[in-house]
Amino acid sequence: KLNCFKNGKDEAIGISDEIEKTLKKKYSFNNIAILVRAIFQTREFEERFLKIGLPYRILGGTKFYERAEIKDCIAYLRLIHQSKDDLAFDRIVNNPKRSIGESSIKLIHEFSKENSVSLEIASKQLIEQNLIKPKTKIGLSSFLFLMNKWRNDIKIKKTNHVKLLQLVLDESGYSAMLKNKKDIENENRLENIKELLSAMKEFDGLEPFLEHVALATSVDQDWDGEK
């Protein structure tokens, strides 16, 4: 049986409908598989299966929102949206490399804890009080400057959330980092990021998109292939 669909979303809906029909014929999940040409193409299927509560697992790969480059992008967006998001700060403060070593990150954490402030505020105060190494100060100051710039882009300039991520990828050096090392793995990462940008277009703004990601990554699926 050959079916044609006009886009990935329609394809995911059509195939999920076929899966549900197949399951009603007493087949188990172990009898069903979806083959994709490229790993980024799983995203539409994952979104659909989460929406209808259909359990799944990915063989030979990682779920879309758990891929390192996607988590990096989401961390940037989360920190732009909420400056007190310490988990996001930790993930991206030296990603790409900004000469902010482990000892400096440890210092930021200690200062944050001692003064009951976020990691971002701790970083600003360490710079202001000249308590951080000169080389680290340059990288950290640049990072904080960009964070402030991106917040102004979305709040004052009203830059839409899709364009915002494109700016982040370009201005942070993240895209260049992936493009400069030309191999299959980084090509796949760039394709995954393109798919993320496409997914973001389905939402009205940054906040609803981040809420969707939080929901998608919080779902704990119990897999039982015999059901």
Q: Positions of the model-derived regions?
A:
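Accessory C-terminal helicase-associated subdomains
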Residues: 28, 96, 125-227
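C-terminal helical "lid" of AAA+/P-loop NTPase domains
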Residues: 106-111
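Conserved short internal alpha-helix adjacent to the catalytic or cofactor-binding core
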Residues: 1, 51-54, 62-96
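A short beta-strand-loop micro-motif that forms or neighbors metal/cofactor-
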Residues: 112-125
